[in-house]
A protein has these predicted regions:
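Extracellular glycan-recognition surfaces and repeat-rich motifs
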Residues: 1-22
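Secretory/extracellular carbohydrate-interaction modules
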Residues: 19-145
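Short, aromatic/His-centered strand-loop micro-motif at the edge of beta-sheets
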Residues: 112-126, 146-171
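Structural motif
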Residues: 17, 52, 180-182
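Short tryptophan-centered beta-strand motifs in secreted/extracellular beta-sheet-rich domains
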Residues: 168-176, 181-183
Length: 245
């Protein structure tokens, strides 16, 4: 795994795993600590086409500013550009399957009927190209709401809010295959969806905590940036096991 941290963030190896932390700070700088297995690779060579991921995890608070989580994605926005030595990647439509926490400033959904904040089990499945991308791009300068509605027809997504005390240790398991995505908490199936990223588009594992927010609301409002951390925050994990199927 690649181990990375921005300024005012840290990664610490523990007896059974890792502790990823970000320091107390204002909303002027990005703070991120992460583990991944893809950031040195071009997107077409990301390592996984189906996987089972197991770990135990807890965080400092159930209401942290920013985002944190663990799972797989295609790094659609080239976010690893924030770290030196990472390859350039053009933006892409999202493909992801993950346990994802988003503070209230975030809204990462392209439909109006799925939860997009709090602690979620979430999946996105997108094509490489779709004819509706052309009118979506043309509509963006004039109507962000129309663009969002068109993207909602292109990007398949599914999510479920999870009722879990994330400040306590829990076991999490994610199963991704071409036909389904399944999310387990303490060996109990918490969510299952037929919306699953195509195996033809490989994904990479990411485990992270940061102070970032991004939103594309149902009203068409776009927002992104970084948030203040009134207190230090950390994500601790142990017993990480990744099995490619």
């Amino acid at each position: 795994m690649n181990v990375k941290a921005t300024q005012n963030a840290s990664t610490e190896k523990t007896e059974k795993g890792w502790r990823l932390g970000i320091q107390k700070g204002d909303s002027l700088s990005y703070r991120d600590a992460q583990l991944d297995d893809y950031s040195l690779l071009p997107r077409r060579k990301f390592p996984h086409r189906s996987i089972t991921l197991n770990l135990r995890a807890k965080v400092t608070s159930s209401s942290l500013p920013g985002t944190w989580g663990f799972g797989l994605w295609n790094d659609p926005f080239g976010l690893s550009l924030g770290f030196g030595g990472s390859p350039f990647r053009l933006p892409a439509l999202p493909n992801a399957v993950w346990f994802f926490y988003a503070s209230p400033q975030n809204y990462l959904s392209f439909t109006g009927d799925k939860p997009a904040q709090g602690f979620l089990a979430q999946t996105f499945r997108s094509p490489i190209f779709h004819p509706l991308l052309i009118p979506a791009g043309l509509a963006l300068p004039f109507s962000r709401k129309a663009t969002r509605n068109l993207l909602g027809k292109i990007i398949a997504e599914d999510s479920s809010a999870l009722s879990v005390d994330v400040t306590q240790w829990h076991g999490y398991r994610l199963e991704w295959s071409a036909k389904r995505s399944a999310f387990w908490v303490d060996d109990v199936l918490a969510f299952e969806s037929p919306v699953s990223p195509h195996a033809s588009r490989p994904l990479g594992v990411i485990i992270w905590i940061d102070n970032q927010f991004a939103a594309f609301t149902p009203e068409g409002k776009i927002g992104f940036g970084v948030l203040e951390n009134p207190e230090p925050a950390w994500l601790e994990l142990e017993d990480l096991k990744i099995v490619s199927v």
